[in-house]
Amino acid sequence: MAHENVWFSHPRRYGKGSRQCRVCSSHTGLIRKYGLNICRQCFREKANDIGFNKFR
């Protein structure tokens, strides 16, 4: 059993490891509200394109 077969072979069905950003595939800082599933860094870049406006 080589390292390639063992790495990430554990099933991730729940928890932070099971979800990733749909833009950059990062697992950290996910915004899951409204079904976005985008990390906060990508959200700041794409917020205007998605339709979020900053009122301030």
UniProtKB/Swiss-Prot annotation:
The entry's keywords: Cytoplasm, Metal-binding, Phosphoprotein, Ribonucleoprotein, Ribosomal protein, Zinc
Cofactors required: Zn(2+)
Sites bearing Phosphoserine, chain numbering: 25
Main location as per UniProt: cytoplasm
Keyword Cytoplasm attached: yes
Bound cofactor: record note: Binds 1 zinc ion per subunit.
Transmembrane spans: none
Molecular function terms, GO-annotated: structural constituent of ribosome; zinc ion binding
Range of residues in the leader sequence: none
Family, as annotated: Belongs to the universal ribosomal protein uS14 family.
Misc: Present with 6490 molecules/cell in log phase SD medium.
The protein's name: Small ribosomal subunit protein uS14A
Upper taxonomic lineage: Eukaryota, Fungi, Dikarya, Ascomycota, Saccharomycotina
Chain's gene name: RPS29A
